[in-house]
A protein has these predicted regions:
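Flexible, surface-exposed loop/linker segments and immediately adjacent secondary-structure boundaries
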Residues: 3-150
Length: 150
């Protein structure tokens, strides 16, 4: 678990993640998730991009949980807005706006009949989101009462 600027991250074991910056800028511009799982909270303002094997996710100040594998990427927009695009089919795009884990998605590898599809909420907790937001002096929009695990 760590903080970069006003963003906080919880990287699960056996994950491989690269942090992206432009030139010598101190600001994070995005992440490349090579494999594994990461829960992230991002401050509003600057746009960032998360790249996984099968998906590109445009961040607009939000919280996301991502599981990246070679055959699919799981994306839960815990709250906020993201733009999800398939890397295997650039025409497969979706804007997701949520308040509280409303629309998790799978983004499939190329060749799948449907590139972006609904998914269940899995493997992350509201308590983890509350902790990450607290590290950067914020609270999640759903509050702190009765956190639960999915």
């Amino acid at each position: 678990m760590f903080v970069v600027g006003r963003d906080a991250f919880l990287i699960r074991p056996e994950s491989s993640v690269e942090f992206l910056r432009r030139g010598n800028s101190p600001f994070l511009t995005g992440l490349r998730i090579l494999s594994g799982r990461i829960l992230s909270v991002f401050s509003p303002g600057r746009r960032r991009t998360i790249q996984a094997v099968t998906a590109t996710i445009g961040i607009r100040g939000t919280a996301v949980y991502i599981e990246a594998a070679t055959d699919r990427t799981y994306v839960c927009t815990c709250y906020g807005t993201v733009e999800i695009a398939s890397r295997g089919d650039p025409t497969a795009r979706e804007t997701v706006r949520t308040k509280h884990h409303d629309q998790p998605r799978y983004v499939m590898a190329s060749g799948a009949p449907q590139m972006i599809m609904g998914a269940p909420v899995v493997n992350h907790t509201d308590a983890e989101l509350i902790l990450l937001e607290a590290l950067v002096g914020r609270t999640p929009p759903f509050g702190t009462a009765q956190p639960y695990r999915y």
